[in-house]
UniProtKB/Swiss-Prot annotation:
Protein name (record): Kinesin-like protein KIF22
Gene: kif22
Main location: nucleus
Biological process annotations from GO: axonogenesis; brain development; central nervous system projection neuron axonogenesis; eye morphogenesis; microtubule-based movement; somitogenesis; thigmotaxis
Annotated localization: Nucleus; Cytoplasm, Cytoskeleton
GO molecular function: ATP binding; ATP hydrolysis activity; DNA binding; microtubule binding; microtubule motor activity
Species annotation: Danio rerio (Zebrafish)
Amino-acid positions noted as binding ATP in the UniProt annotation, renumbered to this chain: 103-110
Positions in coiled-coil regions: 421-471
Length: 634
């Protein structure tokens, strides 16, 4: 069973605290970024102090003091040695460490964290140092095993994406019972050497979302977080296991969209970046305020993942990158104020250690122990004697004496009983199997009988259908109508009855437009009884079922042409009222038709209606269908 071991601060007995260390790095002055040649607005005053011009009063300056100030000429190695390297040994002792770069866009955050091949940044130097520390501890402490792994993700538009698995979707953020933040489904890649890390990290970095803006040719459009996990396991008892994590975070820079010229997707990305950084500032303000108030970690996925770094249990270092040019003045001013508030945050790191407690199963007591247990001595007395016996030299081992005859008799009886029960179970099982086989055979015979009946029925059905088809070859017209005398004793009142289509008087239009095709699958006749409108006679008609007759609607070309001429005549000579009487022609369309006639003359064909504004091909087709059917109904 694994249990969590809290580590206290030596003799004091209270948890250690670790303040967030803040380092400020000033990017070198760039002429092309200073369009007005105004010079630098920031100046260093020492290894920890700097000053910036007060925008409210140009004759004054504002001074800031941090843990470390890196000037324009500071190298990548100096930044790593002074700010990052001191916290790395903590992860080999089961604690967490965090390094993140903060600042406006174009201030050099990605250069500080990644660097280049000639000047590696914080990430490659830190990972290499972790492998060096593990190698050194392996030589000093022989009873421990070490395993190193990495995970790499980005937060793009408030979506957590796995950079080691580019095809992954938005990953959820969870919290376990110990309040540790974790991401289910995030790829964890074991590492054996720094070269192995290089193989995985470089392609994954290319998967990160970047784009060009007016202020930065290669602007990061997402926050990137690299997690290095070191697990230290003890080979022998008590089999302790310590887990340390190193978070290396490259934040995207805050942007002023009026200067970057962001539009479309760039504008959406900028909004997500600024919102997450604003939530980060709210978290810092809440931590500085204290008083047990709510800290809005859950308001953003970035602050949710940085929860351990700010006010959590990690040794944290924030590298604030600033730009010296005047056009970045307010971005630099805001970044310095944020850094000044962040250095007041206090974390409480502890060792994450699990101890595998050995689980010893209670063994059977020997006969001598049972006899000793039956003597009525208290349990604590026996345990004291057992402790004394541990310190005394153990007696020599004696060969075990032969068991008593009564014990042998009991064992033989038990064996016979067990063998007998097994034989009975075997016989019962065989009987059950035989019965099941018999039932299966009966079911098979019954199934065969049912199949024979089904085949016979299908043959009879096929014969009947064939005879029906042969009969239809000589009979295609409907049977004549037969009159039947009314059986009513008294004349009933006249009532409205809907006359079926088969017996109603066929109109001339229906004679030319509707054709009945008798179905060839006619099986039986159905007698249909209906009533004439006067309610005095019943007419019996032997007709095929309606579902067995296929009706097909077909328009006579002459009738269709007649309808189109009638519509064309209305379009050319109709008044406003007559035009509105056409289907799908309202007041507006009627006025447009009359205006078109005055300008272009009469319509030569109905298709000319498509030339009028607002009459599309689809509307014209619907217009033709509706008016042709309407004219037929008349």
């Amino acid at each position: 069973m694994a249990q969590r071991v809290a580590v206290n601060d030596g003799a004091a007995g209270s948890k250690r605290t670790s303040r967030v260390r803040v380092a400020v790095r000033l990017r070198p002055y760039m002429d092309k970024q200073d369009e007005k040649s105004e010079g630098s607005c920031v100046r260093g005053l020492g290894p920890q102090k700097l000053e910036i011009i007060n925008w409210r009063n140009a004759t004054e300056t504002l001074q800031y003091q941090f843990d470390v100030f890196h000037g324009e000429e500071t190298t990548q190695q100096e930044v790593f040695l002074t700010s990052v390297k001191p916290i790395l040994p903590h992860i080999l002792n089961g604690q967490n460490a965090s390094v993140f770069a903060y600042g406006p866009t174009g201030a050099g955050k990605t250069h500080t964290m990644l660097g280049s091949q000639e000047q590696p940044g914080v990430i490659p130097r830190a990972v290499k140092e972790v492998f060096n520390l593990v190698g050194a501890q392996k030589k000093e402490q022989d009873g421990w095993e070490y395993s190193i792994g990495m995970s790499y993700l980005e937060i793009y538009n408030e979506k957590v994406l796995d950079l080691l698995s580019p095809g992954s979707q938005d990953l959820p953020i969870r919290e376990d019972k110990d309040r540790n933040i974790l991401i289910p489904g995030l790829t964890h890649t074991p590492l054996s050497s720094f070269a192995d890390f290089d193989t995985h990290f470089i392609p994954a970095s290319l998967n990160r979302t970047t784009a060009s803006t007016k202020l930065n040719q290669r602007s990061s459009r997402s926050h990137a977080i690299l997690l290095i996990k070191v697990v230290k396991s003890q080979r022998g008892p008590p089999h302790r296991q310590q887990t340390g994590k190193l978070y290396l975070v490259d934040l995207a820079g805050s942007e002023d969209n009026r200067r970057t010229g962001n539009q479309g997707i760039r504008l959406k990305e900028s909004g997500a970046i600024n919102l997450s950084l604003f939530t980060l500032s709210k978290v810092v303000d809440a931590l500085n305020t204290g008083a047990g108030g709510r800290v809005p970690y859950r308001d953003s996925k970035l602050t949710r993942l940085l929860q351990d770094s700010l006010g959590g249990s990690a040794h944290s270092v924030m590298i604030t990158n600033i730009a010296p040019e005047y056009k970045y003045y307010f971005d630099t001013f805001s970044a310095l104020n944020f850094a000044a508030k962040s250095k007041q945050i206090v974390n409480r790191p502890f060792v994450r250690e699990t101890v595998l407690a050995p689980t010893i199963a209670p063994g059977k007591r020997t006969r001598e122990e049972q006899e000793a247990g039956g003597s009525g001595e208290p349990q604590n007395k026996r345990s004291k004697e057992g402790k004394k016996a541990e310190h005394s030299p153990s007696p020599p081992l004696h060969p075990q004496s032969s068991p008593d005859s009564s014990v042998l008799d009991r064992l033989l009886a038990l064996e016979k009983m067990m063998m007998g029960s097994a034989e009975r179970e075997r016989l019962n099982l065989l009987k059950t199997v035989a019965q099941s086989r018999k039932e299966i055979q009966m079911l098979k015979e019954k199934q065969k009988e049912l199949e024979d009946k089904a085949n016979m029925f299908n043959k009879q059905k096929e014969t009947t259908e064939k005879e029906s088809k042969d009969a239809l070859l000589f009979k295609t017209d409907l049977p004549p109508l037969h009159r039947k005398q009314s059986t009513a004793a008294k004349p009933r009142k006249q009532q409205a009855v809907v006359t079926p289509l088969q017996v109603s008087q066929v109109q001339p239009l229906q004679q030319c437009a509707v054709v009945c095709k008798p179905s060839q699958t006619l099986v039986k006749k159905k007698r249909v009884q209906t009533e004439v409108c006067d309610g005095k006679e019943n007419i019996g008609v032997d007709l095929p079922p309606v579902e067995d007759v296929n009706w097909e609607s077909r328009l006579d070309p002459a009738l269709l042409e007649q309808s189109r001429k009638k519509i064309l005549q209305t379009l050319n000579s109709g008044s406003l009222k007559e035009l509105k009487s056409l289907q799908q022609i309202g007041d507006k369309k009627a006025k447009l038709i009359m205006g078109w006639r005055e300008i272009n003359g009469d319509f030569t064909q109905v298709e000319d209606l498509k030339k009028i504004e607002g009459v599309t091909v689809k509307r014209f087709s619907s217009f033709i269908k509706a008016n042709i059917l309407s004219s037929m109904g008349k």
